[in-house]
Swiss-Prot record:
Species in which this protein is naturally found: Clostridium kluyveri (strain ATCC 8527 / DSM 555 / NBRC 12016 / NCIMB 10680 / K1)
Xref: SUPFAM superfamilies: Ribosome-binding factor A, RbfA
GO cellular component, as recorded: cytosol
Recorded family membership: Belongs to the RbfA family.
Signal peptide: none
HAMAP family the record matches: RbfA (MF_00003)
GO terms of biological process kind: maturation of SSU-rRNA
UniProt protein name: Ribosome-binding factor A
Underlying gene: rbfA
Single GO molecular function: ribosomal small subunit binding
Subcellular compartments: Cytoplasm
Amino acid sequence: MTNYRSGRINEEMKREISNIIRNDMKDPRLSAMVSVTKVDVTKDQKYAKVFVSIYGEDKSKDDTFQVLKSSESFIRREVGHRVKLRNTPEIIIEMDNTIEYGMHINELLHKIKENEKHDNE
């Protein structure tokens, strides 16, 4: 039963944090596209790790990540207003590179396939 509840909390926070980043943050340095990929709330609901993927050039990725890190308290306050929890967890934003890693692996597999194709000819 608690796994079901924690899963619902994670998904609700993910949805609300995505909306906050997309609609409520007005910082001009937030130029890259940001996607919240996962939220992990601890069992005691004191902390929430928010994993984000940022698409864009390296400079804009770094700027966007710094804006998000400095906005953790703003995001926490907004989540507290929108999600009904006894205590609002402290937000910890972390970079999620799994999509980029997956694209890299896909590219390597494609190169291997091309090499095998040329070797067979």
